C-alpha cells in the first residue's frame, strides 16, 4: 500500500487516452468494459479511462482525497503541475462502481533513480520491488492504496512513450478471452504470465489506444510483480 501517513495519499488512476477513431474505440471499450458512465468515459473500481481526441495529450492523474492540498505538497516536493512530467493529481468525482478492476498500469522512465524519486519520493507510493531486466533496464513496482504502478526505467526508455499499457484483472480468463473473441476483438490465446500463479492474454486492438492485457491471479498474492 502507499504510505498511509503521506499527505498526498494517492489511490486510483484516471487515464486520458488519445485515439484516432472515437467511434471504433468506443465500441471496443464497450465490449471490454461495458457501458460508459458518460461519452467516452469508463469507470472501473479503481480507475477511470477517458478517450480523448487524437491531437490531445495523454494524461495520467492519480486520485487524491484533497487535490488542493496534494498540489501544494507536490509543489513543496519540487513537482510543478505545469512541469515536464505529464502526471498529476485529481479528486474522485463519483462513487467507485462495482465493475472492472485495474491490476496495474505500465509507465516508462529514462532513469531508475529519478523514477524512484518521482513516484516514491514525490507521489508517496510504496516501492515494493526492483527487478533487473538487463541492458541497464529495471522494472520498478510501486503501490498506491488501490493498484500497482509498474515503471520500466533505463536509458533505452528515453525515447519511448510515457504510458506503456494497462492490465485488467479477471477471475476467469478463459471465459473472458472467449467472450472477447466472440464479440470480435482480436485477442491472443491465454498463456502463463511472468508472475508465478498468473495467466494472461493480450487484447490486440489498436483502437484501444494503448497495449492492453488481461490477467488472472490464482491465488492473489502480495507480490506486486
What residue spans do the PLM features occupy?
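Core segments of cupin and vicinal oxygen chelate
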Residues: 1-49, 53, 72, 77, ...
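A short, sequence-level motif marking secondary-structure junctions
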Residues: 53-56, 154-158, 217-220
Amino acid at each position: 500500500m502507499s504510505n498511509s501517513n503521506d499527505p498526498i495519499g494517492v489511490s486510483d488512476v484516471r487515464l486520458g487516452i488519445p485515439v484516432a477513431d472515437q467511434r471504433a474505440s468506443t465500441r471496443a471499450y464497450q465490449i471490454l468494459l461495458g457501458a460508459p458512465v458518460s461519452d467516452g468515459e469508463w469507470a472501473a473500481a479503481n480507475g477511470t479511462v477517458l478517450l480523448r481526441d487524437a491531437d490531445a495529450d495523454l494524461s495520467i492523474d492519480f486520485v487524491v482525497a484533497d487535490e488542493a492540498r496534494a498540489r501544494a505538497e507536490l509543489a513543496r516536493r519540487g513537482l510543478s503541475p505545469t512541469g515536464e512530467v505529464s502526471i498529476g493529481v485529481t479528486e474522485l468525482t463519483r462513487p467507485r462502481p462495482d465493475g472492472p478492476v485495474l491490476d496495474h498500469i505500465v509507465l516508462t522512465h529514462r532513469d531508475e533513480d529519478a523514477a524512484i524519486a518521482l513516484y516514491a519520493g514525490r507521489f508517496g507510493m510504496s516501492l515494493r520491488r526492483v527487478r533487473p531486466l538487463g541492458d541497464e533496464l529495471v522494472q520498478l513496482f510501486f503501490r498506491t492504496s488501490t493498484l500497482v504502478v509498474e515503471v520500466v526505467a533505463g536509458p533505452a526508455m528515453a525515447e519511448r512513450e510515457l504510458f506503456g499499457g494497462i492490465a485488467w484483472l479477471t477471475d476467469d480468463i478463459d471465459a473472458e478471452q472467449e467472450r472477447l473473441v466472440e464479440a470480435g476483438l482480436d485477442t491472443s490465446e491465454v498463456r502463463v504470465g511472468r508472475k508465478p500463479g498468473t495467466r494472461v492474454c493480450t487484447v490486440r486492438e489498436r483502437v484501444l489506444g494503448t497495449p492492453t492485457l488481461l490477467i488472472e491471479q490464482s491465488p492473489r498474492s502480495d507480490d506486486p510483480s
